[in-house]
Amino acid sequence: MAFLGHLVLGKVMAEECPLSAPLVLKDMQSGVAGETGNVWTIAPDCSFTVARQVGLNLLQPHKQGQLTLQQRLQLEQMMDRMAATALPEQLGSGPQVNARRITLAYGGKQSVLTLPPGGGDLGALRAAASDDSTRHMLDLANDLKAMMGGG
């Protein structure tokens, strides 16, 4: 009987979302119209949205859903990696004209990776990254985008 209770408890714990606050990933490109790009958000109930942002306006989500059990477990592993490797607030090159910025925000903390304009595929950027924090940030961004679907 105790074993059955442990199985049920394990199932309930696995189904819970590992977030206590929204997790937000932004991939933005600066330009004439301000910053434009995509915003991926996972809520504490593990529902998610993907929306375009143009300037200061966040448009209606063009994709939304609920993370699967496997995705929740993957998210829990990502959160453990984030906790183990504190990302600095600023990564990458300094201010640039028309920079690309990847921002990861959770629980009142935010890390911003500044890249040259355009930037390209996150995998290629990761391969060219010169430090572990930048590679870690690009890994997290790539994994989150894959989990919720591209932009």
Question: Residues of each region from the PLM?
Answer:
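Extracytoplasmic/periplasmic, Sec-exported soluble proteins
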Residues: G34, K63-Q70, A129-D132, H136
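Bacterial N-terminal signal peptides
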Residues: M1-L7
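A mature extracytoplasmic/lumenal domain signature
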Residues: C46, R52-V54, Q71, M79, ...
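A short, structured loop/turn motif at beta-sheet edges
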Residues: P44-D45, Q66-L75, L104-S111
